[in-house]
């Protein structure tokens, strides 16, 4: 059997023409098609590689913008044909305060326009047009990747799309199985007295020393005891001035009077922070199950969220937010997610359908995992589909809203 005949057999199996095939044996190109396999040294059980040479003319690439615009227009028309009438959506929002609140959180621009029918229609169509354009661009990009899958740059993009699909699936699983991880955790405070002055102390086992602000030290009348020889600069996430150290002062925790040392530091919004030095010295135990600080067999309950003074929470409420490309907002200090990610944009990283390449080119299907059967009531799914949405969109929205029908409709709108 000659190399040329081998290429013909490959063509019959893969529809790849012989002139686009490059046969490799031991990473060596078989350039002479007239030689037999025996002459080349190929025996039974040997493995051969076929490298496909694809011709990618520049004209289709330049026309990508036009085709993307046409696809976007088709997507928009399909959305408008399948989706509910804008006036129906507007009346549904106005008729249910819970739906309007959900829309206000997820889509403030659309919520603000709900009182004006013409403005609402314009905003809704503009948002649908943007989504259709993004979807068309992604589909066009997927088509280009499918056209030349062996290109190293394309391989990296394919890997990134697969990674993004995994991230999206992980997000959906987290929101479905443990949505509490997206909330904000109340910090641990206990009521104490320092030198007869009552205040709330922040319990932080991650701090090396017990820290007090200069204002609190003045209020407790211990600023006069600050040893400035222990001053300096604290470096961590930023810097802060250390004014000095109070070597010993009395602190009351529960009914216990304990000696404690304080490092007086500027730049802290918290009056008193109980660090690891004080906690270990008195063998304190943070018991989260009981919600208390156990110290010398005495339980001191942590303050509830409603009992924590407002000024102690300002640092966390006014914390800088890190915005992601998909709309998520994460607290820079606490890590709390205060605005859920745009699931539609994240999940569209891997479109479920892409334009098919020519039959003589290998195809790489980049798809998210198929949607599983929903665990939510069929009545809820039916009510959403009656508004013009597909069953898959209804199930995804119910998963994101943890089964809440109004919240799911708010996500879709």
From Swiss-Prot:
Disulfide bonds: none annotated. It is found in: Cytoplasm. It comes from the Eukaryota. InterPro entries: DDI1_N, Peptidase_aspartic_DDI1-type, Peptidase_aspartic_dom_sf, UBA, UBA-like_sf, Ubiquitin-like_dom, Ubiquitin-like_domsf. It comes from Aspergillus terreus (strain NIH 2624 / FGSC A1156). Residues 375-413 form the UBA domain. Probable aspartic protease. May be involved in the regulation of exocytosis. Acts as a linker between the 19S proteasome and polyubiquitinated proteins via UBA domain interactions with ubiquitin for their subsequent degradation. Required for S-phase checkpoint control. Keywords: Aspartyl protease, Cytoplasm, Hydrolase, Protease, Protein transport, Transport. Residues 1-57 form the Ubiquitin-like domain. One of its GO terms (biological process) is protein transport. Residues 59-85, 337-379 are annotated as: Disordered. Belongs to the DDI1 family. Its main location: cytoplasm. GO terms for cellular component: cytoplasm. GO terms for molecular function: aspartic-type endopeptidase activity. This is DNA damage-inducible protein 1. The lineage of its organism: Eukaryota, Fungi, Dikarya, Ascomycota, Pezizomycotina.
């Amino acid at each position: 059997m000659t190399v040329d005949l081998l290429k013909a057999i490959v063509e019959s199996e893969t529809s790849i023409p012989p002139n686009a095939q490059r046969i490799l044996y031991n990473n060596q190109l078989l350039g002479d098609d007239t030689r037999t396999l025996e002459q080349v040294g190929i025996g039974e059980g040997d493995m051969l590689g076929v490298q496909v040479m694809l011709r990618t003319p520049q004209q289709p690439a330049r026309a990508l913008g036009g085709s993307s615009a046409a696809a976007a227009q088709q997507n928009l028309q399909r959305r408008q044909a399948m989706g509910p009438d804008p006036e129906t959506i507007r009346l549904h929002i106005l008729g249910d305060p819970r739906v309007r609140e959900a829309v206000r959180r997820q889509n403030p621009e659309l919520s603000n326009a709900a009182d004006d029918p013409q403005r609402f229609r314009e905003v809704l169509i503009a948002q649908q047009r943007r989504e259709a354009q993004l979807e068309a661009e992604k589909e066009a990009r997927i088509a280009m990747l499918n056209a030349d899958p062996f290109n190293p740059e394309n391989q990296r993009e394919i890997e990134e799309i697969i990674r993004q699909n995994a991230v999206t699936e992980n997000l959906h699983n987290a929101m479905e199985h443990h949505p509490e991880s997206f909330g904000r955790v109340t910090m641990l405070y206990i009521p104490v007295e320092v030198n007869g002055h009552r205040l709330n102390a922040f319990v932080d086992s991650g701090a090396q020393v017990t820290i007090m602000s200069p204002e609190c030290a003045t209020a407790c009348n211990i600023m006069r005891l600050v040893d400035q020889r222990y001053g300096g600069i604290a470096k961590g996430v930023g810097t802060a001035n250390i004014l000095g150290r109070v070597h010993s002062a009395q602190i009351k925790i529960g009914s216990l009077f304990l000696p404690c040392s304080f490092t007086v530091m500027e730049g802290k919004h918290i009056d008193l922070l109980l660090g690891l030095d004080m906690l270990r010295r008195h063998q304190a135990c943070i018991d989260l199950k009981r919600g208390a600080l156990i110290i010398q067999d005495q339980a001191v309950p942590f303050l509830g969220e409603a009992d924590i003074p407002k000024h102690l929470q300002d640092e966390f409420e006014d914390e800088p937010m890190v915005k992601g490309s998909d709309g998520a907002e994460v607290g820079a200090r606490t890590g709390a997610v205060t605005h859920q990610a745009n699931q539609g944009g994240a999940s569209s990283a891997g479109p479920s359908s892409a334009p098919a390449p020519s039959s003589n080119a290998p195809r790489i299907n980049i798809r998210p995992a198929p949607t599983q059967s929903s665990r939510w009531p069929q009545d809820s799914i039916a009510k959403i589909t009656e508004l013009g949405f597909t069953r898959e969109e209804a199930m995804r929205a119910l998963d994101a809203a943890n089964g809440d029908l109004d919240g799911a409709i708010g996500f879709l709108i």
